[in-house]
A protein has these predicted regions:
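Bacterial Sec-dependent N-terminal signal peptides
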Residues: 1-23
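Beta-propeller domains
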Residues: 19-95, 101-105, 113-139
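Aromatic- and glycine-enriched pocket-lining scaffold segments that form the walls
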Residues: 140-162
Length: 162
């Protein structure tokens, strides 16, 4: 009986699929990785060029939505979004941006940006609505300051209640 239960559990995991918001990464000099198939696939079509901070987000199926170096936001076609330039992050910041889904509006995302350490821009946020511009997204609020000065570090943790 234990063997049957164990085999059932093993087979069941094949039917489970995780959400793939982090399945695609863009970084460095036009580089990227696609983890949708399990093993990483090299991508060479990215638009950003940064030595340090960047952020990427995909939808729950692993399709690229947008990415940023903290200054420019590129859509899934690797073009700058409308209003997507001039964010107050810095690509020399170790964590220039982090993208967080809006908890109440599934088509909106926060981009939190960090300036270089002890610079005047500090931590800011902008809001992307991915339903605009034919599904490619648009920045609807930009560079709303949270705190200054600040360090170059950003992180986010999903709350236990979802």
């Amino acid at each position: 009986m234990k063997k049957i239960a164990f085999c059932f559990l093993l087979v069941s995991f094949n039917f489970l699929t995780a959400q793939k918001e982090a399945a695609i990464w863009y970084f460095g000099e036009n580089a990227g990785l696609d983890f949708n198939t399990g093993a990483p696939i090299t991508l060479l079509d990215g638009a950003l060029n940064t030595r340090e901070g960047c952020a990427t987000i995909s939808d729950v199926n692993g399709s690229l939505l947008f990415y940023t170096d903290g200054i420019t936001v590129w859509n899934s076609n690797h073009q700058p979004m409308p209003n997507g330039t001039g964010l107050l992050g810095d690509p020399s910041s170790t964590q220039s941006a982090i993208i967080v889904p809006h908890p109440g509006i599934p088509t909106q995302f926060y981009i939190f940006t960090a300036d270089k350490i002890k610079e005047v821009n500090g931590i800011n946020y902008s809001v992307v609505d991915i339903s605009l511009d034919g599904g490619l997204g648009d920045i609807i609020q930009k560079n709303i300051q949270l705190v200054t000065p600040s360090a170059e570090k950003l992180t986010a943790v999903k709350h236990a209640n979802g």
